[in-house]
Amino acid sequence: MSSEAKMVDISQKETVLREAEAEGFIKLKNDTIKRIIENEIEKGNVITVAKTAGIMAAKKTSELLPLCHLIPLENVDIDIKIENSGIRVRSKVKAHYKTGVEMEALVATSISLLTIWDMVKKYEKDENGKYPYTMIDDIKVIDKIKEKD
């Protein structure tokens, strides 16, 4: 085995439907959640911007992760749910291709969560400018489907 980085050769693999779903959670202050629900965030509609950012990020995965293949995505769906202690993001990605789309789903979820943090950081800081309560957690692939060859 080489210590050199190299992209996996997928040229001999069949093109089939690939789907992946990932999710993650951002813990927020109750006041921030209330502001999001009431659309009182200075930067705009948090849910809309986070969904848009996640979709854009999924399409850029191969530019961010050097050994990922450039996959022609057919659908990216971002579902964002406000919960008691924060926001859950779930991303589902589909493509007909030779390799899976789980990294695209993870990137979509991660960037959606980071976008939420960016948009609400003003409200999450404590008196010292720190974020003792805010936390992104539990990012994982929750489903992966590969159509039979």
Swiss-Prot record:
Gene3D superfamilies: Molybdopterin cofactor biosynthesis C (MoaC) domain. The keyword Lyase applies. The active site is at 118. It catalyses: (8S)-3',8-cyclo-7,8-dihydroguanosine 5'-triphosphate = cyclic pyranopterin phosphate + diphosphate. Keywords: Lyase, Molybdenum cofactor biosynthesis. Pathway: Cofactor biosynthesis; molybdopterin biosynthesis. It holds the Pfam family MoaC. It comes from the Archaea. Substrate binds at residues 67-69, 103-104. Its EC number is 4.6.1.17. One of its GO terms (biological process) is Mo-molybdopterin cofactor biosynthetic process. GO terms for molecular function: cyclic pyranopterin monophosphate synthase activity. The keyword Lyase applies. NCBIfam families: moaC (TIGR00581), PRK12343.1 (NF008999). Belongs to the MoaC family. Catalyzes the conversion of (8S)-3',8-cyclo-7,8-dihydroguanosine 5'-triphosphate to cyclic pyranopterin monophosphate (cPMP). Homohexamer; trimer of dimers. This is Probable cyclic pyranopterin monophosphate synthase.
